[in-house]
C-alpha cells in the first residue's frame, strides 16, 4: 500500500511539474492587423485557412480582433456588444468556427476586449449620444448617461463616478464603479467564454480604468490568459533618445499587473521601446544597472508579453514602428529570451518572414525556454549583444562578427540572419514546453 502511495505521489508531482512548465512555455500570435476588416469574404473565414500555419509558428495562444458591432470598422469603438454579426470581420457563426479550428490545434483564443469606452446608438433629451443598445431583445447592456463617468462632461449627466483612469476623448468613458456596469459586462464576458469558446482576454486601453476594476472582470470570468495594453511612454533625453534608466516606465507596468493579479500579464512596451533603439547601434541599452534585461522582462518576466510590433505600432498606422530592416533582430531577441513572446501576423505572412520566425520559435520550444528562463547577459556594447539563456542557447545581435571568444566550443549555430545569430548547446535539448533541470 505504501509503495503504491509513493508511486501515485510521484506521478501526481510529475504531472503538476509538467503542467507548470507548459503554462510557462507560452507564445502569443496576433491574428490580425489594422486593415484585416477589409478582407473580401471576411477575415474570420480567411484566417480559418491559416490556422495550421499559425500553429506551426509555435503559438499556444492567438489574439483575435474585437468581436462586436463597432462604429469604427476595426472594432475599437464598440456599441452593441452582443451583436457579433455586425462585425466587419465576419459573423458570430464564423467566429465560433474559427475558435473551434484553433482549439483543434491546441491553440487558445483571446478576445480583444474594449470596455473602457462605448459608442451609443441614440441621443437623450439633451441631444447627446449617450443611450446605449446592448444588441439583444432584452435590456442587457441597454444603458443611459448614468453609466458614463461624471468627468466625461461631453457625454455625462453628472451622476456617474469620476473616471479611475485615463480619459478617452473619442467616445463616452464607461463608469466601471457602477454595479450594473460590472455585472452586465461580466455576464457578457462569460457569454464570450461559454457560448463562443474564448479562453482569455486582451484588455484594450487598460490604463483607462483602474487595475482593481480590471481585476473584477478577471476574477469573475476565469480566463486562462489575460494581457493588458498599458502603453507606457519611455522617458526621453533632450536629444530625443531614450533615457538610460527606464525604471519609472516599467514600474507603471508592474503596478498594473500587481493590481490585477495573476493570470494578468502586460505588453512590455518598455522592452519594445528600448529594443528598437538598441538595434540602431546602441545595443548597450539591453541591460539595466543591475545587469538584468531593461524592460518589464527584467523584473517580472512571467508577466511580460514581449513584442516587436502590433496593429497600432506597425501595420498601416505605424505609430511607433520597429526599424523595418532590423525586425528579425527583434524576433531573435524575444523568441530566445524570458517573457512571453508575441508574434505579429504581418511579419509572418506579409513580410515573408515565416521560416525565420518559425525556426526561432522551434529553438525556443525544443530547448524548453519559457517565461522565467534564466538570462545571463555576456556582452552588451554598441555593436554587439550576447546572452545565454538557461545555459543552453546563446543569442547574438549586432553587426560585429567576432564575439570575442565567449561562445563555448560545444555550442553550434542553429539560426542566423541579418545581424543576428543563435547557438545551441549539444545534448541538452528537452521535449517542447518542458523545463530542463
From Swiss-Prot:
Example GO BP: starch catabolic process
So where does Ca(2+) 1 get bound?
Answer: 116, 163, 166, 173, 208
What does this protein need as cofactor? Ca(2+)
Record keywords: Calcium, Carbohydrate metabolism, Glycosidase, Hydrolase, Metal-binding, Signal
Signal peptide residue numbers = 1-25
Query: Where, by residue number, does Ca(2+) 2 bind?
Result: 133, 136, 138, 142
Q: Which reaction does it catalyse?
A: Endohydrolysis of (1->4)-alpha-D-glucosidic linkages in polysaccharides containing three or more (1->4)-alpha-linked D-glucose units
CDD domains per the UniProt record, alphabetical? AmyAc_arch_bac_plant_AmyA
Q: Which residues form the active site?
A: 204, 229
Q: Which GO terms describe its molecular function?
A: alpha-amylase activity; calcium ion binding
Q: What is its EC number?
A: 3.2.1.1
Q: Does the keyword Metal-binding apply?
A: yes
Matching InterPro entries: A-amylase_bs_C (IPR012850), A-amylase_pln (IPR013775), Alpha_amylase (IPR006046), Glyco_hydro_13_cat_dom (IPR006047), Glyco_hydro_b (IPR013780), Glycoside_hydrolase_SF (IPR017853)
Binding-site residues for substrate, renumbered to this chain: 69-71, 76-77, 202-207, 231, 233, 251, 292, 298-300, 311, 317, 396, 401-403, 413-419, 423
| Tissue expression profile of the protein | More abundant in germinating seeds than in young roots, young leaves and callus.
Q: Does the keyword Secreted apply?
A: no
Query: Pfam family of this protein, just one?
Result: Alpha-amylase
Site description Transition state stabilizer, residues in chain: 312
Q: How does it assemble?
A: Monomer.
Q: Which family does it belong to?
A: Belongs to the glycosyl hydrolase 13 family.
- Function text: Important for breakdown of endosperm starch during germination.
Give the protein's recorded name: Alpha-amylase isozyme 3E
Amino acid at each position: 500500500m505504501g509503495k503504491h502511495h509513493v508511486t501515485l505521489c510521484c506521478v501526481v508531482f510529475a504531472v503538476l511539474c509538467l503542467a507548470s512548465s507548459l503554462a510557462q512555455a507560452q507564445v502569443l500570435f496576433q491574428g490580425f492587423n489594422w486593415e484585416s476588416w477589409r478582407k473580401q469574404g471576411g477575415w474570420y473565414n480567411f484566417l480559418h485557412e491559416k490556422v495550421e500555419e499559425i500553429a506551426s509558428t509555435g503559438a499556444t495562444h492567438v489574439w483575435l480582433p474585437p468581436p462586436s458591432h463597432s462604429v469604427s470598422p476595426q472594432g475599437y469603438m464598440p456599441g452593441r456588444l452582443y451583436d457579433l454579426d455586425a462585425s466587419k470581420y465576419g459573423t458570430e457563426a464564423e467566429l465560433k468556427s474559427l475558435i473551434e479550428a484553433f482549439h483543434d490545434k491546441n491553440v487558445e483564443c483571446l478576445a480583444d476586449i474594449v470596455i473602457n469606452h462605448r459608442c451609443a446608438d441614440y441621443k437623450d433629451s439633451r441631444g447627446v449620444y449617450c443611450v446605449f443598445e446592448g444588441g439583444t431583445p432584452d435590456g442587457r447592456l441597454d444603458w443611459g448617461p448614468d453609466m458614463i463617468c461624471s468627468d466625461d462632461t461631453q457625454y455625462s449627466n453628472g451622476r456617474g463616478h469620476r473616471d479611475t483612469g485615463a480619459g478617452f476623448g473619442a467616445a463616452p468613458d464607461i463608469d466601471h464603479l457602477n454595479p450594473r456596469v460590472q455585472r452586465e459586462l461580466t455576464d457578457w464576458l462569460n457569454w464570450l467564454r461559454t457560448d463562443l469558446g474564448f479562453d482569455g482576454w486582451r484588455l484594450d486601453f487598460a490604463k483607462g480604468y483602474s487595475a482593481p476594476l480590471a481585476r473584477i472582470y478577471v476574477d469573475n470570468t476565469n480566463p486562462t490568459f489575460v494581457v493588458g495594453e498599458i502603453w507606457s511612454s519611455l522617458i526621453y533625453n533632450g536629444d530625443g533618445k531614450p533615457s538610460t534608466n527606464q525604471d519609472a516606465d516599467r514600474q507603471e507596468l508592474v503596478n498594473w499587473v500587481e493590481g490585477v493579479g495573476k493570470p494578468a500579464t502586460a505588453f512590455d512596451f518598455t522592452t519594445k521601446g528600448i529594443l528598437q533603439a538598441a538595434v540602431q547601434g546602441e545595443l548597450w541599452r539591453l541591460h539595466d544597472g543591475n545587469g538584468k534585461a531593461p524592460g518589464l522582462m527584467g523584473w517580472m518576466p512571467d508577466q511580460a508579453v514581449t513584442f516587436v510590433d502590433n496593429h497600432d505600432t506597425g501595420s498601416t498606422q505605424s505609430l511607433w514602428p520597429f526599424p523595418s530592416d532590423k525586425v528579425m533582430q527583434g524576433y531573435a531577441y524575444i523568441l530566445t529570451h524570458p517573457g512571453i513572446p508575441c508574434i505579429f501576423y504581418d511579419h509572418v505572412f506579409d513580410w515573408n518572414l515565416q521560416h525565420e520566425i518559425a525556426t526561432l520559435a522551434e529553438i525556443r520550444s525544443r530547448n524548453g525556454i519559457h517565461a522565467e528562463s534564466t538570462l545571463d547577459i555576456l556582452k552588451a556594447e554598441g555593436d554587439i549583444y550576447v546572452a545565454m539563456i538557461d545555459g543552453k542557447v546563446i543569442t547574438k545581435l549586432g553587426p560585429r562578427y567576432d564575439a570575442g571568444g565567449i561562445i563555448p566550443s560545444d555550442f553550434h549555430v542553429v539560426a542566423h540572419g541579418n545581424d543576428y545569430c543563435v547557438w545551441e548547446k549539444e545534448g541538452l535539448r528537452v521535449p517542447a514546453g518542458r523545463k530542463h533541470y
